[in-house]
Amino acid sequence: MVTWLLIFLLILPFAFVLLYGAPYLPTRRAQAKQALDMLDLQEGDVFVDLGSGDGAVLVEAASRGLICYGYELNPFVWAISKLRTLKFGKQVHIYCRNFWNIPLPENTKGVFVFLLDKFMSRLDKKLTRELTKGGQLLSYTFQIPGKKPAVVNRAMFLYKY
């Protein structure tokens, strides 16, 4: 009985995030590099990863000199991302919180997201309200319904808006 309870408690955070975004899928370093290459960001720009998982994209962004913010609901992968980004100090801020309830940081220039298709319209509304003028969105796998991406990387299913 205790074993089943422990298994349930371990699986619960991974299943819970499906209500608000997408399941945890690790991003490889090469994928993070390719993704960030698509964004026109300069050292010191504010970058946000909505559903930051294990912090792979944040590590790559911070290594480019970006000021990074990550939001992750799953406490296990959030803890991993905190550990992975310790070397960047105050350059990287990671929160175990629901990004739907928090405004984007001031002067956000770039946003990376992997969300399920059903959340993309809601994300578009949030970014229309909160993203800095000229800010960029890079979506992994899913497009915003009714909007044409400015750039598409079909090999990696990346869509830049």
Where in the sequence are the language-model features?
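C-terminal substrate-binding/active-site "lid" region of AdoMet-derived donor-dependent transferases
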Residues: 118-161
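S-adenosyl-L-methionine
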Residues: 1-42
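Conserved SAM-binding loop of SAM-dependent methyltransferases across substrates and taxa
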Residues: 54-66
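Conserved SAM-binding motif I beta-strand of class I
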Residues: 67-72
